[in-house]
Amino acid sequence: MGCDFTALANLGIRALSPYQAGKPVEELERELGISNIVKLASNENPLGLAASVQQALTAELSGLTRYPDANGFYLKQALAERFGVDEAQLTLGNGSNDLLELIARVFVSEQDEVIYAEHAFIVYPLVVQALNAKAVVVPASEWGHDLTAMAAAITERTKLIFIANPNNPTGTFLSAEALDAFLQQVPAHVMVVLDEAYTEYVEPSLRSPSFAWVNRFPNLVVCRTFSKAYGLAGLRVGYSVSDPQVAGLLNRLRQPFNCNSLALLAAQTVLDDAEYLAAAVETNHRGMAQLTEYCQARGLAYIPSSGNFLTIDMGRPAGPVYQQLLALGVIVRPIAGYGMPDHLRVSIGLAQENQRFMDALDEVLFR
């Protein structure tokens, strides 16, 4: 007699749908038998791996029979020195997604409330549902966070608030002044996660002093990643800065070897490669101008973005447009699952990759 294993699963897991990542190039090659594919779907760094990282990783290969440093001592030391934080404030993750889930698992219990914005990063609702907690989704304001409404949504049952700045998938950005005022309204018992996965693409003068805020607001956890501007998406390494007591709780639950040896070394190396980071930011700046000028010339509405992607309104259901682009060898990201069925999110690539997308979209929409 068979067993219904779904009935044995935790309540929050039963109706959970897996995270849908951007379509891999290899998958499209298998499906359509085509080559020369351009992938602009997952907000990856188009420059490829930094030369400094390639060299460092090659030298490390002989040590892969050993377990990694479970505490990431040298990476934490480098992060603390670079950003002026204490090593006791740092928690390392297998990408920042790992940390987002870890924070929720530490602080959120069944039936607690978790607040996030409409059109927020899809990992937030997945984490909340997995814990069988209550999601409080605050309607967006101009595709971004309505901080006034989010503050008003806080109740005695609220345990956690997720805020992405810049926001993914819309690219909207909150000023330091607006965030500071919001944090002052949040009760001390409510944790706030500030997800800054794309902060390196923001003009430095506009960025929030988020790490310094942790000393003013001990309930704040700031998460960042090496997957975007630093070009380490395939190695999966991120970090958070929080009150030392919060970091201690996170590290109780964190898997001891969640960052592998190559990831730790790569992150430590690229953190010192200012030239690579500057090139990544400049490439993104030029590519963003290329795509926004194209949209303006074609009369396509888009959401001004502070990230490394542009979200474009197709003026029609975007699903068929996405499929036609796939047939032309261009992978972008449909975001109907974010409540945006007419939009496609397009990662900023190299100039020639952006041109491939624009030529393909011309063929789909205008010919």
Predicted regions and their residues:
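Active-site pre-lysine segment of PLP-dependent enzymes
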Residues: 147-156, 169-192, 196-229
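Phosphate-binding glycine-rich loop
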Residues: 65-113, 131
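PLP-dependent aminotransferase-like
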Residues: 106-163
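Conserved PLP-binding catalytic core of the aspartate aminotransferase-like
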Residues: 285, 295-328
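Short acidic capping loops at alpha-helix termini that bridge into adjacent secondary structure
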Residues: 36, 86-90, 110-113, 157, ...
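N-terminal "arm"/small-domain region of PLP-dependent enzymes with the aminotransferase-like
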Residues: 2-66
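PLP-dependent aminotransferase class I/II
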Residues: 71, 219-303
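PLP-dependent enzyme catalytic core of the Aspartate aminotransferase-like
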Residues: 324-328, 333, 337-367
